[in-house]
Swiss-Prot record:
This is Sulfate adenylyltransferase subunit 2. Disulfide bonds: none annotated. Belongs to the PAPS reductase family. CysD subfamily. It catalyses: sulfate + ATP + H(+) = adenosine 5'-phosphosulfate + diphosphate. GO terms for biological process: hydrogen sulfide biosynthetic process; sulfate assimilation. The gene is cysD. The keyword Amino-acid biosynthesis does not apply.
């Protein structure tokens, strides 16, 4: 009897699970980066499947900046309690003491100190030699050329010209002392794949992904939602209630909402089939300087 042919999503799922299992077996101290977004939620679901009925054999790490949406933090804590995984939350203590924030210090400095340097601190503190990330190649041009096994030097820096070939699904995980890798099990997924898989597997998400009436201010052509009293308004700016949702999530002053009526998974998938805009157009950190994402990744960013 001929074997049943796998669907597109089943093939992606099988590939990702194989990568997760291989890294868990090959490396001494792996960790999964958990940003609380939709891609992280899918990656967490895949990790749970990979080791079911056992528990995930490595911790999840959230690099907090102090500026995440309140709904994201509540969702993070609820997921950890529900599934019983080990959750590590790290915030850069020096940046916190200096009061680094996106309003007074700008997006580039805030991202470097609170996210990039914060991540490197946590990786060094716990001695992780492999870190799973939820990046996909269709997101952004610098990520399009990144390998599944993305090698980093002892300072966690990425050199795109010094990476290893990956033939078919054969990965070389040998690293020298002090070096590490970032692993991207979702590399071959698209944004639409992610949403269809979320629908198929009934994966829980932060409610911010779904359209609702929210208080936003228009700034530079982008809609920014006020999540707490720290939100600073420029002269002439005022809040207005709009029906919006978030296509991607990050620090709330640096993440723009979009007009949308998609308040269900079915409507979001329909919206994805029709959209022609970039998923990351709402991430202000991607446009704070030329070739911004690649520069950040070279310095140790996700």
């Amino acid at each position: 009897m001929a074997g049943r042919e796998l669907s597109h999503l089943q093939q992606l799922e099988a590939e990702s699970i194989q990568i997760i299992r291989e890294v868990a077996a090959e490396f001494d101290n792996p960790v999964m980066l958990y940003s609380i977004g939709k891609d992280s939620s899918v990656m967490l679901h895949l990790a749970r499947k990979a080791f079911y009925p056992g528990k995930i054999p490595f911790p999840l790490l959230h690099v907090d900046t102090g500026w995440k949406f309140k709904e994201m933090i509540a969702f993070r804590d609820a997921q950890a309690k529900k599934f019983g995984f080990e959750l590590l939350a790290h915030i850069n203590p020096e940046g916190l003491a200096q009061g680094i924030n996106p309003f007074d210090h700008g997006s580039a400095k805030h991202t470097d100190i609170m996210k990039t340097q914060g991540l490197k601190q946590a990786l060094n503190q716990y001695g992780f030699d492999a870190a799973f990330g939820g990046a996909r190649r269709d997101e952004e041009k610098s990520r399009a050329k990144e390998r599944v096994y993305s090698f980093r030097d002892r300072h966690h820096r990425w050199d795109p010209k010094n990476q290893r070939p990956e033939l078919w699904r054969t990965y070389n995980g040998a690293v020298n002392k002090g070096e590490s890798i970032r692993v991207f099990p979702l590399s071959n997924w698209t944004e639409l794949d992610i949403w269809q898989y979320i629908y198929q597997e009934n994966i829980e998400l932060v409610p911010l992904y779904f359209a609702a009436k929210r208080q936003v201010v228009e700034r530079g052509g982008q809609l920014i939602m006020a999540d707490d009293e720290r939100m600073k308004l420029a002269e002439g700016e005022q809040f207005k209630e709009e029906l919006v949702r978030f296509r991607t999530l990050g620090c709330y002053p640096l993440t723009a909402a979009m007009h949308s009526e998609a308040d269900s998974l079915e409507k979001i998938i329909e919206e994805m089939l029709l959209t022609r805009s970039s998923e990351r157009q709402g991430r202000l950190i991607d446009s704070d300087q030329s070739a911004s994402m690649e520069q950040k990744k070279r310095q140790g960013y996700f």
